């Protein structure tokens, strides 16, 4: 059985812990907290009521039993009530003028990079990283998998050189030489 880095590829995909596991280069990644809020469907005339998700200054996902509002982007964690108020205020134009009844909330950290692009690519001869997908992980993580697999297998990458450079793990080195290390989140 090969050990780490001997004859087989290793992929580090450990959110913010990837920063400590990738020792060959400094990654500017960290946790940024966010909160989703579930509210009772607001009392809005049926002609004005949403029937589809809205994404903009936050997002609103209407449902029969609850609507979901989100999401905060907190460099340092906020009190839940502050986050709820932010989500309601950010989406007020879709919620009508009546009272809003919060039902519950869910808080979590998301790993992000200093430039908000995911970190995807080779960090040494046998190691790749996939991290900092932020709130777009359901789109960028499968893309990361295809990039890493194509590199491991020696295939043509499924992205332009510009896209590869924007996600490359070594992109922080030159920036840090100019400005120092940028701290991300908590």
Functional labels for PLM-detected ranges:
Residues 1-6:
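A conserved short coil-to-beta-strand element within the FAD-binding core of flavoproteins
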Residues 7-8, 34, 88, 117, ...:
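A generic alpha-helix preference that emphasizes hydrophobic side chains
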Residues 7-18, 145:
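Short hydrophobic core segments
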Residues 16-125:
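Active-site substrate-recognition segment that forms the wall
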Residues 100-186:
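C-terminal catalytic lobe of FAD-dependent flavoproteins
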């Amino acid at each position: 059985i090969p050990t780490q880095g001997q004859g087989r590829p290793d992929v580090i995909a450990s959110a913010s812990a990837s920063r400590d596991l990738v020792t060959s280069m400094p990654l500017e990644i960290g946790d940024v907290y966010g909160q989703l809020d579930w509210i009772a469907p607001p009392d809005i005339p049926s002609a004005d009521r949403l029937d589809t998700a809205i994404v903009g200054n936050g997002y609103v996902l209407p449902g029969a039993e609850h609507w979901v509002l989100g999401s905060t982007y907190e460099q340092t964690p906020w009190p839940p009530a502050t986050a709820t108020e932010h989500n309601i205020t950010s989406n007020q134009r879709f919620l009508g003028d009546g009272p809003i009844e919060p039902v519950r909330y869910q808080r979590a950290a998301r790993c992000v990079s200093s430039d908000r692009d995911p970190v995807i690519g080779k960090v040494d001869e046998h190691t790749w990283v996939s991290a900092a997908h932020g709130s777009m992980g359901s789109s960028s993580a499968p893309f990361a998998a295809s990039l890493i697999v194509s590199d491991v297998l020696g295939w043509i990458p499924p992205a332009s050189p510009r896209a590869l450079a924007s996600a490359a793990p070594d992109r922080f080195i030159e920036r840090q030489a100019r400005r120092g290390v940028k701290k991300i989140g908590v």
